[in-house]
Amino acid sequence: SHAEFLRAIEALRDRVRGDKALTERILHKYSIKNVMGMNLLPLVRFDDPFEIIAHLMVGSEGTLAFLAGVTMRTEREYEHKASAMVYFSDIGEASRAVVEMRKLQDSAGERIVHSAEMLDRKSLASVGDATGEGLTAVLTETKAHTPEELAANVARIGELLGRFTLYVPARFTDDPAEQAKFWALRSGIFPAVGGSRPAGTTCLIEDVAFHIGDLPRATAELQALIARHGYDDACIYGHALEGNYHFIINQSFSTPAEAARYEALMDDVAELVVGRYDGSLKAEHGTGRNMAPFLRREWGDAACAVMRAVKELFDPAGLLNPGVIFNDDPRCHLSHFKPLPLTDPLIDRCIECGFCEVNCLTCGLTLSSRQRIVVRREIARLKASGGNPRLVRELERGYRYPGERT
């Protein structure tokens, strides 16, 4: 029996609900995308301890339990879709348009704009969009169950966009092939930016979220902040309809000055997102070690204490994914940098994102493409440092079959 465990869950539930300020804080934080820290919303939303336990798993990043299987419940797909790449000369104007598009609803009170993906000028340049210099685009999608509903949606969105200054008139298409080209541009940003980065640098992607009303000012300030720290090749893109942006930087950690520049950037990002706008430092991708030092700054003492209590209840020995979400080192994001030694011109372009593995012919047979690259980089690192020649020989010998013959 796990009666004691269940009683502890109920006690945490009651502790949270008995603190009005904390309850309101939790509801406010989850009014936008937020995966920073442990998921506290189940303690507010559910009464049954089993439901609370199941929902605590969401976003726990392996710190509470091992998930052996997941069943996904899919939603019905709309039969009719239309997309447009809407170009603006100014990122602030683009953000204001997104805020207004989010308000559009059908007769049932459902949003008629289903996606509004922001692509700033560097994002567009990375994927070869030549529409114009220095533009910002919003990839906009609407969906419907009938052609008539789709046409009505497109007309309403077009009417709204007519109130804004566009670089060229918006043109929606319901052609699946044309829409696929738009979305291929969107999905190609991360690998394009990473693949063109200076050799030896690390491609880092962060994702933050703002409340939708703050989006125009926050977007411009985030762009200016990144530029102020000298990241001239950085780009901002993402799910603007949800106030959620990704930004990509190419960072060298080869000198103390570069590490200090990165530290200053992250401190300023935290101050902008949390201190100024009370947003989320992590909207989708999980806290990880890079944001763990900023957990208390975002959530405050009371919420962090509950998160710690959840962790200690599930994992009293601290064995599961240590250092992730909770880390007592306030500078843990500035140590143990992963080296990317120069290895081969082709290999040096790899950002180790793993997107290629779904199409890799040898993944599961011997080594995937990414695994081969990791081994090659480790051999190069050991050779460059002059350390452990015995390990170098073992790696080279062991690599021959899985890395070269298959």
Language model segments and positions:
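FAD-binding subdomain of flavoenzyme oxidoreductases
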Residues: S1-E93, A97, A317-N327, R331-L342
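Short beta-alpha connecting loops at secondary-structure transitions
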Residues: H80-A84, C203, F253-E258, R289-E298, ...
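Feature representing long, continuous alpha-helical segments
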Residues: A65, A220, Y245, D267, ...
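Activity-critical C-terminal alpha-helical subdomain
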Residues: A192, S196, P293-L342
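Ferredoxin-type iron-sulfur electron-transfer modules in oxidoreductases and energy-metabolism complexes
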Residues: F326-I347, E357, C363-T406
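C-terminal substrate-recognition/cap domain of FAD-linked oxidoreductases
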Residues: N34, P42-F50, A54-A264, L272-S280, ...
